[in-house]
Amino acid sequence: MDIKRTVLWVIFFMSAVMLFDNWQRSHGRPSMFFPNVTQTNTASNATNGNGASGASAAAANALPAAATGAAPATTAPAAQAQLVRFSTDVYNGEIDTRGGTLAKLTLTKAGDGKQPDLSVTLFDNAANHTYLARTGLLGGDFPNHNDVYTQAAGPTSLAAGQNTLKLAFESPVKGGVKVVKTYTFTRGSYVIGVDTKIENVGTAPVTPSVYMELVRDNTSVETPMFSHTFLGPAVYTDQKHFQKITFSDIDKNKADYVTSADNGWIAMVQHYFASAWIPQQGAKRDIYVEKIDPTLYRVGVKQPVAAIAPGQSADVSARLFAGPEEERMLEGIAPGLELVKDYGWVTIIAKPLFWLLEKIHGFVGNWGWAIVLLTLLIKAVFFPLSAASYKSMARMKEITPRMQALRERFKSDPQKMNAALMELYKTEKVNPFGGCLPVVIQIPVFISLYWVLLASVEMRGAPWILWIHDLSQRDPYFILPVLMAVSMFVQTKLNPTPPDPVQAKMMMFMPIAFSVMFFFFPAGLVLYYVVNNVLSIAQQYYITRTLGAAAAKKKAS
């Protein structure tokens, strides 16, 4: 029997490992067993002798024939382009005059001596990574992202005392149409105004459409080991609300999303940060998501423009968000935009938990202590359930010697052994599963808190005490993972010893296995689990001691 159980445990363990490896590969992570074929990005960052960026041109050249109604993918003309560098209080970036494309955008957040430099590059057009925001016209041979624009004269930095910075770019005349594209940056804001003025300088009416798209490769962003957050396009409409689209679904032509709307937005989502085009509410638009190169994808909207007579013009305004996934800020920008902060399937529980965590942080001013206090509050709320669980485990621990005696007596007759055990449970009024149900009820809450701490950009660069300077990074000295292992070991000792030796060994092995994982988890997550375990040990010790005192008093009387 022991050999059979050992074999079953080995099969279970290997199955779990293989399932985890398959999960890793399905989410774009390297396999533990099978080597990945290295994919190279076709976009180049070569520059010409005059400082012109060839990256956008290379990306454009890589695009196959576009789907009907999607943005053009014509070969870029030979005209030279250049990069226009700009800076605001929250951004440093580059606009490529080829298409007036936002080709590089760095979110600047300098360190203050106590906290590290938290600057991060979101948009980029390098040899190993492509992520762009671009616009253009459809419906004829009109200016698009392949044409070289001319920068209008003006400042490129947000000066002290200045609240806005405008950068304007003018296209060449194509098809009797000229486009003036204006980016408006506002102090303290991660929302960029993008205005497209379409001038008909020809002799016949034109009916163009404006496309706005985000182009990105499938390069994964750095996340903690054993953790996964969503990376890919997303679409939000009033019809279907938030729809995430994986790169693998696009590869398989299985992308499911609303293709026409007059509301909502489209986005590219990654861990902690996102970008989103937000067209004018009420403006009809078509939505497209597609693969345009072996490792390059795009999500965009195509917005029709009413007929423009010769000598007349039309204006199309939109907003481009590019910044951190700060929930409260996102709620004020556009309906549903806060959903880019990915809580997975536990959103309904995770959002209230983050709200509570945020309120606690408002009082204590430290995210580490906010985690400690929130965990304490959750344990207090669930104390009645935990007490019921610990009481059941304590009663099981009391009758364990008698259970072992029955198993030894009837080891050759499993049917009689089970009947004797059931009679013992009935006599002692013990439910062998009584300790499980209260724990199962609490699991969704603890999983939700896990996702809150994993997905919240507020943890990035947030210190706690002493050696913990960033709750989003692993403990540099592994002190918290060691405390986690010790707390799990203590919990194991407090629980009833399984009668099966194999199960007993597995219970002893679990703290070691989990500790290995927690060595790579963000410090904020490990802090939560350590505090939760310490409080659980204290609760269990208190309840067990109270029950023991009550039993001794009853026996004495």
From Swiss-Prot:
Q: Which GO molecular function entries does the Swiss-Prot or TrEMBL record give?
A: membrane insertase activity
- Judging by the UniProt lineage, the source's domain of life is Bacteria
Q: Which residues cross the membrane?
A: 3-23, 363-383, 437-457, 476-496, 507-527
Main location group:
membrane
Pfam families under this entry?
Answer: 60KD_IMP (PF02096), YidC_periplas (PF14849)
Q: Does the keyword Cell membrane apply?
A: yes
Query: In which family does this protein belong, per the annotation?
Result: Belongs to the OXA1/ALB3/YidC family. Type 1 subfamily.
Record's function text: Required for the insertion and/or proper folding and/or complex formation of integral membrane proteins into the membrane. Involved in integration of membrane proteins that insert both dependently and independently of the Sec translocase complex, as well as at least some lipoproteins. Aids folding of multispanning membrane proteins.
Q: How does it assemble?
A: Interacts with the Sec translocase complex via SecD. Specifically interacts with transmembrane segments of nascent integral membrane proteins during membrane integration.
Q: What is this protein called?
A: Membrane protein insertase YidC
